[in-house]
Amino acid sequence: MVPFAGWEMPVQYQGVIPEHRAVRTDCGVFDVSHMGELEVEGPRAHELLQSLLANDLDKIEPGAAQYTLLTNERGGIIDDLIAYRLEHGRYLLIVNASNSDTVFQWLKERELPGSDVRDVSDDYALLAVQGPRSIERLGLDDAPPFTFATAELDGIECIVNRTGYTGERGVELMVPAEDAADLWDHVLERGAVPCGLGARDTLRLEVCFPLHGNDIGPDTDAISAGLGWVCALDKDFTGADELRRINDKGPARKLVAFVMEESGIPRQGMPIAGGGEVTSGTHSPMLDQGIGMGYVRAEQAEPGSELTIDVRGRDRRARIVKKPIYKQEG
């Protein structure tokens, strides 16, 4: 167990590699109840969120969700989150645990008359059931990604979200906190392998999902981070002017994915020759080599370009690759 954003979290159960492979080949379950949940409700809830979130909420109807960013005036990423449109005038935001209080305060300070922001994190638990057999093992009907619906699983009513942080088919099950332990047991009985933070990190890095605090943050703009696709630059939101400027001019640096060409495991903070830096790194269980992401000068950022990374005092060759680093065959 390790401390994480005020929680005690398991790094592993059986081991990072078997847990990782279970998710890639079958089904694993993560207790992600540390994530924050915020409800935004009222006749002006949509207006409030449209003025603050980078993506365009007009593109989703009730029953759908959207990956989006909360940005500051400089276009920096306060948090990356998922917005669920529960109904007209009512939203649920799933935010990173370490940013939950910050996001809540940011929204609360900007509340409009006719909008109400509430922190409901203590009311809910969240289990991520991920892997190619996850839907089958849970006995659920499949649904398109980034949609959600209410369903009953072994007598427990859940909100079933077709979302995840692994790059695999899967769902995130949201239940009242008092039902969490029973639901966890039911999911294990259905054959899911319990997984910890270690596998969660290696899985997300293989598919190049950014981690707030490593790859993105308040001092990292969305364009440089490769998240311009999340930003509706044709609407106004906090930071939009700066993001439009960076987008038009072109960023000075870019977040790239790479694989190691020599032995060595890259880690956050390791220097990349030419003024760059590793933001995330690990050993890929599926590729059996070191992989990572990091920022380099824009002119260095083409796939196929070679990098030199200082791995514990020794120069090691790496190669920039297209994202995702790992892609499931078929």
Map each language-model feature to its residues:
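Short beta-strand and beta-hairpin "edge-sheet" elements
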Residues: 78-81, 320
